[in-house]
């Protein structure tokens, strides 16, 4: 007998079946669902997606659809009874608000009611006029009525738009042109793979760009693309160095440019390089490697040069690829970037590390069109950057081991070589070799300009006589800079440094020292005094150096304590004052240090803390920096002696001594732990026993005399402070910092009439530190 599960059950014949309409789907028996239903493959765009809402970021969902992955393809399967409910009829009328975006057309933009989104409504209604083909049935009268209502509403809106356009004046036409420009900006951005929404945002800035007068840049024979990019940077007119050097560089001459700090030397060589790259793109010149090489003495300056050139290129429809090659970062990533780089900016050490082992890369760099040496006097200082000379030799096809005779022969051959198409551009604020001599020794004048530039001519290969452009031959200091000097003892510099910072609160300050150890000591000292102090020196990791610069730029009251690694080229906005904790070793260092403030048309101050043993170097510094300035200047002294309030300094001394003791103790403990770890590891490697107590006795017994004996005894004493003693010192310092410094106010008879109590209360609410009046630094304005 056949099992019951395999028997076929026939439907009961109750009567003749009614005739089914074509538009009514055939009802399927629930008992047939055990078999597979017929499913069809549908494209994702043809499905009727339903929007969840704006709260979910515009998420759309659909029901009754199976998703099947076939290899790399994704298919959407819809069952037969749900085809019509989940699939959008392509011939159905598309409403303007629901029609998908198909990109901008080539026709002119028709401006309508912007708030209601009716721009280009004629194109939106083009699809709705198509006749409906096979969609006929019971719902036909209802759909026809909806279509008639939509056409009526559309005609009314078009009539309203026409009335609005007829009533607009010239201002409306100008707005229309701006919208057209914005749409064109979107098309340009999309063609080059940029951010479309960023282009839409840029369309709102056309009015601001039209207000910028760029007539001063037009006379420099620059392309409209470059002028437009400069306009986006809001540079109204070129600086003196830019106005004189850009035409010479564009004409193909080698240039040596000298200008004061903060005068725009970066764009003076950056604009011609980008201009040349645009010309090569228009001419269809095939890329054979990097077009330009820029050498920088420090990592921070190299990064800044790259940021400035990238900002210039951001305003171009097509821009060169700028690559920064510095130490402290991944060398593999930099090697990959060099494969596609057009403009390379690097420091000599890392750049030579990349070039030295790659002959193919050296051959590509030998074909560069521009060689730019920024801060050339620092790069080619005798005995400083051996890698810079090796890089120049590699560009000329020489190996580092070539002797002098082979170099002379190659120089004679290169003079007859017509393929030497490389332009050499040299920029700095100081080319006088006399400024590089040490202030502590006796230096002789190096003579005229020809003798001063002779050392550069030996290092660099110019195609001929370079154009020497000096825009400020009289003064090498910025016009808005005021210079001052504070006389103090060698052991009182910490006190007077803190006094200057307190007398000038709310200023972004840059403190320069001559040693890394001073940076490591001053940073915790000022931090203990509740000041935002940040370190910067060459032994820090590169990411830590970037972090210090970013924090210094972000905070208005921050203090950056740095060595001369931050003296050249750094363009930090709104640096109010520069303090020289040590007198610089050379005059050119003082010029570049002071150039971190008073950049461009802004003002700033530069103050030297001068100890008695530094008086002679300070006099030589003043004579070298300001000797050429004529007597027609109004100021009697270029470096003014500041009569700082000694009473305020004496009242601040207790808190400075406490902070210094805490900082020295922490540094001594860290140093002892580091030395102990090193000696213990060395003893383990040698296989001998290490006894720290015996070593301490030896070190303590050798303190009778000799150099550094007193310092070692102080470190030994600071090392022995216990944790409880450190806590007591910190509590005492907190108590000192919580009180305001009294500068002569009678606390016992405060209502006697001689004290402005209201002013004291207001100063206390604003964070004032003193009780009484202070004269500041005493600059003669």
From Swiss-Prot:
It is found in: Nucleus, Nucleolus. Keywords: ATP-binding, Helicase, Hydrolase, Nucleotide-binding, Nucleus, Ribosome biogenesis, RNA-binding, rRNA processing. Residues 104-116, 402-419 have a biased composition (Acidic residues). The keyword Nucleus applies. ATP binds at residues 259-266. Residues 137-154 have a biased composition (Basic and acidic residues). The Q motif is unique to and characteristic of the DEAD box family of RNA helicases and controls ATP binding and hydrolysis. Belongs to the DEAD box helicase family. DDX24/MAK5 subfamily. SMART domains: DEXDc, HELICc. This is ATP-dependent RNA helicase MAK5. InterPro entries: DEAD/DEAH_box_helicase_dom, Helicase_ATP-bd, Helicase_C-like, P-loop_NTPase, RNA-helicase_DEAD-box_CS, RNA_helicase_DEAD_Q_motif. Pfam families: DEAD, Helicase_C. The lineage of its organism: Eukaryota, Fungi, Dikarya, Ascomycota, Pezizomycotina. Residues 494-643 form the Helicase C-terminal domain. Gene3D superfamilies: P-loop containing nucleotide triphosphate hydrolases. ATP-binding RNA helicase involved in the biogenesis of 60S ribosomal subunits and is required for the normal formation of 25S and 5.8S rRNAs. It catalyses: ATP + H2O = ADP + phosphate + H(+). Residues 1-10, 19-34 have a biased composition (Basic residues). Residues 246-449 form the Helicase ATP-binding domain. A motif (DEAD box) lies at residues 374-377.
